[in-house]
Amino acid sequence: MKIKVTFQERIIEHNFETEITNLQQVTQKLCSLFLITNYYSYSLFLSSGQLVDNINLIDEGSEIIIKHLNRLGTISIGSGYSNSVVGTTNNNAPSSPSSSININGQQIQQQIQQQIQQQQQQQQQQQQQVQLSPDTLINNLLNNLKDNTFKKKAFFDLKDLKEEILIKKFVEKNGIEVIVCQLKELTGNTLSYALSALQTIMSYEFTITSMTSTDTASLITQLLPLTENTSNPSISKTSLSLLCLFLNQSNNLNFKQFSSTLVLEYNEKTKRNYNHTLVQLLSSSNTVDVQLNALTLINIIIGKTMSTTIPGLENGSVTGGENGFNKLLKELDEYEINQKLKKLVESIIVAPELKRQLYIYQRHRFQVITNRKNVTFNKESSEHDALLMKLWSLTYPGVKLESRVSEQWKQMGFQGTDPCTDFRAMGIWGLDNLIYFAQNYNEKFRKIVNSQIDRKEREYPTATAGIVLTFELYNSIFKMGTPNLNPYNSTTSNTTSNTTSTTNIDDLPFFPLFFSHPHAFEEVYCTTFQILDSTWDDMNGTYMHFQKIMSSVKNLIITALESKPTTLEAFDWKCQKNTKNSNGGTNSNQNNSSSNLLLSNFANGSSLLSLLNDLSSSSRDDMKKLLTGVNYQVLDLIKSQKISYFQEGFQFKLHKQLKTKQSLPLNWIFIRLFNNNNNNNNNNENCSYEIQYCFLSTELNQPPLPNQSIPTNYNTIKISDLFFNGESTNSNNKKKDKSLSYFNISIKDEQIQSLIQNQLPLSNLNNSSNSLQLDSSTSMNSIKDSIINISSSNNNIKDNLTNNNTNTNTNNTNNNTSNGNGNSNSVSMSSININNSGQLSPNTTSPILIPQQQQQQPQSSSLSVQHQQSSTPTPSSPVLLSSPSLQSSSSSSSSSSNPNLFTIDLISSNRDDVSNFWDSIKLLSGQEIKSQEGLDDYHSLLSINTSVKLLDLDGIDIPKETPQIPILPDNFDFRTV
């Protein structure tokens, strides 16, 4: 809720992100905006003068005035707010200042006493309401809900209703239907109170079961779009919470209805899937409660989908059961949910409940593996047989398998001639992991298999070892088979089991690593397999040592996961470090971690670029991969920031002004980036950007107009049509102000080219009959019906603007100039009129802007429009100038090498604007950053991110909270201590 607050002569706009329920807290908050500590000595008033004694008086857009109680008596009667605040005075009262003060002071005291009495009366009424029968109390509430005057107060009271008997009476009297029917009409705090009231009512299980299918469908249909309410996070949060309550307490039939409503209504209206909307809420919202409720709803939908069989629906609805479960998770992967959750995991502070929901989602992902593990290998299945043949062809390409049951399988490391007997423990999942390793790391997998021949009597069965690794990862390391930690093993319909809701989240096996890759388990499996093979040689293992070596590898993986790595790179780094430590520190020169090298070189003042070049030229693939990832993240962050600046727009001054045919100087250019998709999507890759610009006419020494006052009429060009040629290095201009930045750009725009090619000479412009002449006896009102003429030489300009959808209608006539007595013949050929207020009225959408003129007498006998504008001290809001001829003060503005480019020299006093503008164009064009400021930012961010990454990989914990500042010593004279 957004309100305007005034204290003395200061005005501040404040936005309440959460619902307000306590007047004292609101007063304290608003007083703190003006650094008022003794807020209890102040009161809030509306702009009408009414004292704010009820929180319901504050609504969206309210204007609040803060007044000191002791100073209200000094306000004279009849001024400002005294009539409303103090009341009407006696006409016979003395008029002296002292008596006026006393009268007002007494009235203030009386009004305060009246407020106390009103509060006491309200308390008595509440006590009386408690004594009323439930029927009477609920009837009063329902009547107030239907009355616009008391509706907001009724919702506010209803959300605090806690007695179960009253809730039952409210439901029996169709109270839910009364609320649902009004949701579409409610806004602001009233809507927030209504949703909170629904949340209170639906927290009782009997309310869900008592709802009809019509009420259920109507409620869900209205709640779904409310979850996207970004202007009021409280509405979005409560709507998501209501959907969670509904699904948690519903039976399977209602969930089918929910899914049907979700697919058939919301998706058709919005042309997108609601699951995608929920995933976007995980990243687009800055409110933790919204992110938490969105993830909770996702978990509930996943759990309900697994336990419910939903008939197939049209338009791509999700079916229930295991197939629907797998399909839903695959769909969430397509919406990049893992990237969103990874950012939540990497947050500075993760709330315990949010961490719990992250764990529950992780268990859902584990369930996919469990389902696959429970599939027994069937030798009669053609699908399973095809998977087995795929493993053979990946391991021995070009080698023909003699038969389905063959001794050749023992070469791969199976125990017998029929591999299906080895998959009993882990089902088809054991085969899936072997295929993943052989397919994605074929060379390494084949090397491990073929190396068993060289080991002779020291070999180990490769395929069998891989199946054992799958078993250990599933049961001992990731604990996927632990029943009491599985969210599905709950007697209730809630997807969060009783165990997970009571167990400390820090005691649960939570692995942030799984949010970094869609196949995180398989990637960990491949890494572990390679560690097993290298450890086998390091320990000179034999088949008799298999269990001992496997136990050592398992402990190594568990130790690496204890540090909670968030990426696979960090996990690999931890494993390598633990492997070297377990081997006794051999090859010490190679064991120095790159992070220690980098940090020590930083301490010695070495160059970042040289260090990064050394690391990137290293033969270690993990370092190259790490640096590539950090570099991509830094560039993506810089690009997002630069694009954000460009979307707000830049205003630059023209080094040499352009002039219109009417001699109006154009001194400024406003240019911005525009997202043509209009979908508020922060993903730059999915945006279709264009560049918009317009010229402004203000005083030469005046600053440009503020961004918010610029109209939305722009010329639009492609990104490829704008060129930043670089900063000016003209040595001839020795008087350049060093505090200013000089640069030039080139614009490829047919409309601008047409305007420039049809320009009139500047020398003929002032004496041309096309200028509207004014003398000392002419006022703006006397020429309000006059129209600026456009000469016949500009027909092609008009045609060009018409082709660009400006819809300019001009009929060229001859204009007779004024003879000095103020009499001029009006001409009806223009798209700019002078209205009754003496202001220019736009009828077109040209990118040329001039400020409105103020009514004032000209100082000379013959003044052009340009002269009158120059006498205006401060430019007011701009209006549009139609179909002007542009005149550059330098003929070199057009590039001689490319006649289609129009080059403009610009000046800026803000160096940051120039660098942000420059870098934005380069990054959007797929080029490298060129400005020195941009390069400095890039190097700084790259340095910080690389250092943090390496510190994390090296096991150095970085505190997430700012350390406390030590207490100052009592004695600073340390020599006497």
Curated annotation (Swiss-Prot):
One GO MF term attached to the UniProt entry: myosin II binding
Ranges where the record places region Disordered: 792-899
Record Pfam families: ELMO_CED12, FH3_FHOD1-3
PROSITE patterns tied to this protein: ELMO
GO BP terms: actin filament organization; cell motility; negative regulation of actin filament polymerization; regulation of phagocytosis; sorocarp development
InterPro entries in the record: ARM-like, ARM-type_fold, ELMO_dom, ELMO_domain-containing, FH3_FHOD1-3-like
Biased composition (Low complexity): 792-838, 852-897
Domain ELMO as annotated: residue spans: 383-561
Disruption phenotype: Null mutants show the remarkable ability to engulf multiple particles simultaneously, also positively respond to a cAMP gradient but form spurious peudopods which are normally suppressed to promote efficient movement up a chemical gradient.
Domain of life: Eukaryota
Function: Functions as a negative regulator of actin polymerization. Modulates actin/myosin II at cortex actinomyosins to prevent excessive F-actin polymerization around the cell periphery, thereby maintaining proper cell shape during phagocytosis and chemotaxis.
Subunit relationships: Associates with mhcA.
Protein name: ELMO domain-containing protein A
Organism encoding this protein: Dictyostelium discoideum (Social amoeba)
Name of the encoding gene: elmoA
